[in-house]
């Protein structure tokens, strides 16, 4: 995990680049569930969020990928209202690439916890993730996943999506 402070230009303020496995989101043909994923993070500085990137390992076929940004209450594990959202189109050319989600500018505050959720109604996408040691979990947030059948959220400190949070200071 890397945090960097720059001047007044867009920069990756928080990034987790390591990946040694993947998490599938979207709809698998083998069952009725839609799989969702996300990542919580503690913001390292004040700034205007303009872009989040995630690393895609595979895209099964062309479709939509939707990202929503939320405030997150880490004590109660509660997702707040949507602060910003964006829907992009992905296809096989996005395989093994950083996919950008350009967001309407949102002011984030240092040390507050936020989170983003990813879903797809019509394709299956493998998002890069890192598996950490249970004795040395990811320090800046938790990976989240769920499906539309169970109505149960799962949070993991020892997993993290591969992501970049870009801020303008």
Regions inferred by a protein language model and the residue ranges of each:
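Beta-sheet-rich sandwich/jelly-roll-like modules and their strand-loop junctions
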Residues: 1-77, 103-113, 117-169
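A short local loop/turn or secondary-structure capping micro-motif enriched for an aromatic residue
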Residues: 91-93, 124-125
């Amino acid at each position: 995990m890397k945090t960097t402070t720059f001047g007044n230009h867009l920069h990756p303020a928080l990034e987790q680049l390591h990946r040694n496995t993947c998490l599938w989101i979207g709809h698998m043909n083998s069952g009725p569930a839609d799989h969702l994923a996300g990542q919580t993070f503690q913001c390292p500085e004040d700034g205007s969020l303009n872009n989040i990137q995630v690393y895609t390992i595979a895209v099964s076929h062309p479709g939509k990928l939707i990202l929503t940004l939320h405030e997150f209450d880490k004590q109660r594990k509660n997702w707040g209202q949507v602060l910003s959202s964006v829907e992009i189109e992905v296809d096989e050319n996005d395989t093994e690439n950083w996919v950008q989600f350009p967001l309407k500018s949102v002011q984030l505050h240092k040390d507050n916890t936020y989170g983003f959720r990813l879903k797809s109604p019509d394709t299956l996408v493998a998002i890069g993730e890192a598996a950490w040691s249970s004795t040395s979990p990811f320090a800046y947030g938790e990976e989240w996943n769920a499906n539309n059948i169970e109505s149960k959220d799962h949070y993991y400190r020892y997993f993290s999506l591969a992501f970049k949070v870009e801020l303008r200071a």
